[in-house]
């Protein structure tokens, strides 16, 4: 989670303290190499353990989850929202099946048909270690939908985080394919539960995201007190490729909640 280092340049000057942590099995945390431990309820309880250890509560605790962390943040809020002051769901949809449909119906057709066919063949054979797989995905998918900065300019903290990724954990939860979810989260969907979330909530989407920005806008209308932030130049890593919209919108949300303002727009 070292890619969150970029938040330091924006939140700290606004006197907003933030804490990011590596979950069990990734980054600098222990890796027990026991895939049976990789399930959503255990990760939710891990967030609660971290909250308790840091002494955070509904007076000061904003939970921001990005990508997979957005899934975790939604699940945490549905169980422990009495501990939250605010919720930020960054670049994540509330339904993995709908994410898969968006990947198939919207993202895949943007590929050159020949390149997509080669990727499909590799996936059909489950030959994910084939170097050709990443050679094709990096310029044709990652550079367009993960981070739109030129590949040679990808920020060092982001590259460092990607290099430390626990692929066993990733495949167990997400599945090996980049086109939708195929792991433990394949049927995850809390769309109908969003109205239960009563804490002020910000959903963030990027125009070029791997996730459907219209769905993330819709999510903000389903929670009781929601606001949507669109990063028009952003992709999945909007905190890097559209900082001009991401951070002012995030900071404004936090300050509005702190001031007791209604977040709906």
Locations of regions flagged by a protein language model:
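Catalytic active-site module of serine/aspartate enzymes centered on a nucleophile-bearing elbow/loop
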Residues: 225-265
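Alpha/beta-hydrolase active-site loop signature
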Residues: 1, 23-27, 69, 94, ...
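Alpha/beta-hydrolase
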Residues: 110, 114-199
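Conserved HGGG/HGGXW glycine-rich cap/lid loop of the alpha/beta-hydrolase fold
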Residues: 1-32, 36
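Conserved loop-alpha-helix segment in the C-terminal half of the alpha/beta-hydrolase fold
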Residues: 191-234
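Conserved hydrolase catalytic core segment
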Residues: 59-102
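Conserved acidic catalytic loop of the alpha/beta-hydrolase fold
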Residues: 42-60
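A catalytic-pocket lid/entrance helix-loop region that shapes and gates access to the active site
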Residues: 86-128
């Amino acid at each position: 989670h070292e890619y969150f280092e970029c938040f330091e340049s924006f939140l700290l000057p606004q006197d907003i303290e933030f804490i990011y942590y590596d979950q069990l099995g990734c980054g600098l945390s222990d890796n027990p190499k026991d895939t049976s431990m990789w399930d959503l309820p255990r990760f939710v309880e891990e967030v609660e353990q971290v909250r308790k250890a840091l002494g955070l509560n509904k007076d000061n605790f904003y939970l921001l989850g990005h990508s997979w962390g957005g899934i975790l943040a939604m699940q945490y809020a549905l169980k422990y929202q009495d501990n939250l002051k605010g919720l930020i769901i960054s670049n994540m949809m509330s339904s993995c099946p709908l994410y898969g449909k968006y990947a198939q119906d919207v993202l895949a057709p943007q590929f050159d048909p020949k390149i997509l066919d080669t990727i499909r063949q590799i996936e059909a054979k489950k030959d994910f270690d084939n170097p050709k797989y990443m050679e094709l995905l990096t310029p044709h998918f990652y550079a367009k939908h993960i981070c739109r900065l030129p590949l040679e300019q990808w920020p060092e903290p982001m590259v460092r985080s990607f290099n430390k990724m626990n692929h066993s954990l990733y495949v167990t939860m997400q599945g090996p394919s980049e086109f939708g979810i195929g792991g433990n989260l394949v049927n995850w969907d809390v769309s109908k539960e969003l109205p239960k979330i009563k804490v002020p909530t910000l959903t963030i989407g990027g125009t070029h995201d791997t996730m459907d920005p219209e769905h993330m806008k819709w999510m903000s209308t389903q929670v009781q007190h929601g606001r949507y932030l669109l990063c028009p130049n952003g992709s999945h890593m909007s905190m890097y490729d559209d900082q001009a919209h991401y951070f002012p919108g995030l900071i404004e949300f936090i300050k509005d909640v702190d001031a007791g303002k209604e977040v709906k727009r």
